[in-house]
Design a protein with these regions (language model features):
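Mid-to-C-terminal alpha-helical segments outside catalytic/metal-binding sites
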Residues: 2-7, 16-70, 74-78, 82-98, ...
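Divalent metal-dependent hydrolysis catalytic cores, especially in the metallo-beta-lactamase
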Residues: 6, 71-79, 89-113, 139-146, ...
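Histidine-centered catalytic micro-motifs
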Residues: 7-14, 202-207
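Flexible loop residues that form catalytic
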Residues: 12, 104, 177, 208, ...
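Short catalytic/ligand-binding loop motif for oxyanion handling, primarily in non-cytosolic enzymes
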Residues: 14-17, 99-101, 107-112, 150-153, ...
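Short acidic, glycine/proline-rich loop/turn micro-motifs
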Residues: 110-114, 230, 341
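Active-site-proximal gating segment of KS-fold condensing enzymes and close homologs
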Residues: 116-132
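Catalytic pocket-lining loop regions of alpha/beta-barrel enzymes
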Residues: 120, 133, 137-141, 146, ...
């Protein structure tokens, strides 16, 4: 019998360079490709697009001060980011019993050329991820991807989540873009309904901040700009929660589960307190028709993942221990690998054992269907 003591609810993979070689022939010229540069390997998401280097997507095993010093390629990156056997070995080193894996470059699916190639890439990725997890399904679960809600009036997202479910994927990541349809848009309703019917949690993962994406290269190079972006990127999560709560998405789909991934948890209590205030004081004249306090909805339908978040853990009662899931973020720059056990013990110092177990194992194991 499998015993789950530590489960990472948010780690990552790096998609293999040949992942999209079998997309329909008519779309092959539009498919993402890996190109090797002097600075390392990079994905080109669409013809003429700027390269997205894999440099910070596979740093596990390197010293922090060396992250950007040497080119990172598929030949020298940690193999656990794309090979299941190597993955399990790295999990053993880190004392992880199970791992929930998010996409790498496919987090940027919205940057592909058009609706058709985005759907084809989603299908290719979801099939590959399902096969990856078959290597050891008692320890590996993969998060699928679905295209933007904008694509084909939302129909592509519905098709992708149904395809992923048929392949055995148990949860999906929703692709988004600046200026795209908001999560409370009527066109999103068929997708939320499909996720609810399929009993598949939907993940909203942190992205780069809108502020950074609007900067010119010379502005981005100014000292402190990148550090600011990494510091504040978690705060964007509150916008997604607010839209879904006050937009009535949770009310219309009471069995829908949403995971807010890698955004930490320290912001959640302050957001919920403010949202409850808005519910009582401002909602009556602003027009939202929701009937339940946002803090109550959160406890029923929302989850959040975090790595090291002592402030959030201290305020855990304000959001519900059952909604919180620890993560290692392997093999990215925020990763706790290979010292997760040591970091967990420090981060959770003074937390009752039963509550700690829920946050570092039980909640994720239950949500993603790991079987003991």
């Amino acid at each position: 019998m499998q015993n789950y003591d530590i489960v990472s609810a948010d780690s990552h993979i790096n998609e293999p360079p040949d992942l999209f070689m079998n997309v329909p022939q008519a779309l092959k010229e539009l498919a993402p490709k890996v190109v090797s540069y002097e600075k390392g390997d990079a994905w080109i998401m669409a013809p003429g697009a700027e390269p997205r280097f894999v440099s910070t997507s596979a740093v596990a095993g390197r010293k922090k001060e060396e992250y950007l010093k040497e080119p990172v390629t598929y030949a020298n990156m940690c193999k656990g980011s794309f090979d299941p056997e190597a993955r399990l070995k790295d999990m053993d080193i880190d004392n992880l019993d199970a791992d929930v894996m998010y996409p790498g470059i496919m987090r940027y699916l919205e940057r592909c050329a058009n609706d058709d190639i985005r759907l084809a890439c989603a299908h290719a990725y979801n099939e590959w991820m399902a096969d990856f997890c078959k290597f050891n399904p008692s320890r590996l679960q993969g998060i699928g991807v679905v295209p933007m809600l904008d694509d084909n009036g939302g129909k592509n997202a519905v098709e992708a989540i149904k395809f992923a479910a048929k392949k055995g994927i148990r949860s999906v990541f929703l692709s988004q873009r600046d200026g795209g349809l908001p999560l409370n848009h009527p066109s999103a309703e068929p997708f939320w309904a499909a996720a609810e019917e399929l009993n598949m949690p939907v993940s909203i993962h942190i992205h780069t901040t809108p502020f950074l994406r609007g900067l010119k290269p010379e502005q981005l190079a100014l000292m402190g700009t990148k550090e600011m972006g990494i510091t504040t990127v978690t705060l964007c999560m509150s916008e997604h929660v607010g839209l879904m709560m006050f937009g009535g998405v949770f009310m219309r789909h009471p069995k829908l589960k949403i995971v807010f991934a890698e955004g930490g948890i320290g912001w959640v209590p302050a957001f919920l307190e403010r949202a409850d205030h808005v519910f009582r004081v401002h909602k009556p004249y602003l027009g939202s028709t929701i009937t339940e306090l946002p803090s109550e909805t959160w406890r029923k339908q929302c989850y959040a993942t975090f790595q090291e978040d002592v402030a959030g853990i201290r305020l855990r009662d304000m959001m519900g221990v059952e909604t919180l899931m620890w993560a290692s973020d392997y093999p990215h720059t925020d990763t706790t690998w290979p010292d997760s056990k040591k970091i967990i013990d420090k981060t959770f110092a003074g937390v009752p054992a039963n509550e700690k177990h829920k946050m570092i194992s039980e909640n994720a194991a239950r949500l993603y269907g790991f079987k003991s």
